[in-house]
C-alpha cells in the first residue's frame, strides 16, 4: 500500500521554507534524486519543484550541475537591498497617498510580534505592502527581487541580527505613517528599515568571511 500522493506544490512549499530558515545552508546542493527520495516521488515531480525555486532565485543552477542555495556576498546584499528600497519606498508612498492600508500587512506584523521565527511573516508583510498599492508594474519589479531578498531575510533571522520586537516596531512606524497619509514619512521609514537590515547583514557576512581566513 502506498502513502498519499505529494503534489509538486507541497514539495515546493517545504523546500522553500527550509531554504529560507537556513535548514539548507548557503552553497548546499539540492538534487532531484535527493528530493525524490525524501518525498517519495518521481524525479520529474522533484524537478518541477526545484525548477520553480530556480526561476524565483531561491536556488541557482548552472548548466549540467545540481541546483544550489545561493551564497550571497556583502556586495550582493547591498545591491539587492538598495534596489528593494527604491521599490518599497515608492510602494508605501503610493499607499499613503491613496489612503490604502493593506489588511494583510497589519496581520503579518501582528504575527511577527507573536513569533520567534518571524522570517515568513516579515516576508509576508513586505509582499502585502507592495501588492496592496495600485501599480501592477511596481509589484512585478518587487516580485523579481524577492526570491533573493527572502534568502537575506532568512539569514537576518538565523544570525539574530534583529529581534522580532525590533522588526515589528519598525513595521508599525511605516503602517502608522501610511495611516496618517504621510507619504514622505512612510517612504523615509521604509528606507531606514531596509538600510538597517542591509548594513547588519552585510557586516555579518564580511565578519564571517574574515573569521574563515
Predicted regions and their residues:
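Short alpha-helical functional segments enriched in proximate histidine and acidic residues
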Residues: 94, 128, 200
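Short arginine-rich
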Residues: 195-205
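Alpha-helix N-cap/helix-start motif at coil-to-helix transitions, marked by capping-box chemistry
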Residues: 6-9, 81-85, 140-143, 161, ...
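Short phosphate-engaging motifs
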Residues: 76, 87, 137-138, 197
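Conserved amphipathic alpha-helical segments that form helical-bundle/coiled-coil interaction surfaces
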Residues: 100-159, 167-177, 185-196
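Short linear motifs at protein or domain termini
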Residues: 1-97, 203-213
Amino acid at each position: 500500500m502506498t502513502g498519499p500522493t505529494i503534489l509538486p506544490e507541497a514539495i515546493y512549499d517545504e523546500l522553500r521554507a527550509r531554504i529560507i530558515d537556513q535548514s539548507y545552508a548557503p552553497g548546499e546542493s539540492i538534487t532531484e534524486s535527493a528530493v525524490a527520495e525524501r518525498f517519495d516521488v518521481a524525479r520529474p515531480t522533484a524537478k518541477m519543484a526545484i525548477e520553480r525555486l530556480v526561476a524565483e532565485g531561491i536556488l541557482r543552477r548552472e548548466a549540467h550541475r545540481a541546483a544550489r542555495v545561493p551564497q550571497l556576498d556583502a556586495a550582493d546584499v547591498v545591491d539587492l537591498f538598495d534596489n528593494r528600497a527604491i521599490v518599497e519606498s515608492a510602494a508605501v508612498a503610493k499607499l499613503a497617498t491613496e489612503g490604502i492600508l493593506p489588511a494583510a500587512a497589519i496581520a503579518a506584523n501582528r504575527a511577527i510580534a507573536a513569533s520567534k521565527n518571524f522570517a515568513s511573516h516579515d516576508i509576508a508583510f513586505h509582499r502585502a505592502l507592495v501588492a496592496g498599492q495600485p501599480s501592477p508594474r511596481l509589484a512585478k519589479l518587487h516580485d523579481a527581487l524577492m526570491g533573493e531578498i527572502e534568502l537575506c531575510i532568512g539569514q537576518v533571522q538565523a544570525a539574530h541580527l534583529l529581534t522580532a520586537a525590533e522588526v515589528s516596531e519598525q513595521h508599525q512606524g511605516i503602517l502608522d505613517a501610511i495611516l496618517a497619509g504621510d507619504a514622505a514619512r512612510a517612504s523615509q521609514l521604509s528606507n531606514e528599515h531596509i538600510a538597517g537590515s542591509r548594513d547588519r547583514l552585510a557586516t555579518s557576512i564580511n565578519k564571517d568571511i574574515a573569521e574563515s581566513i
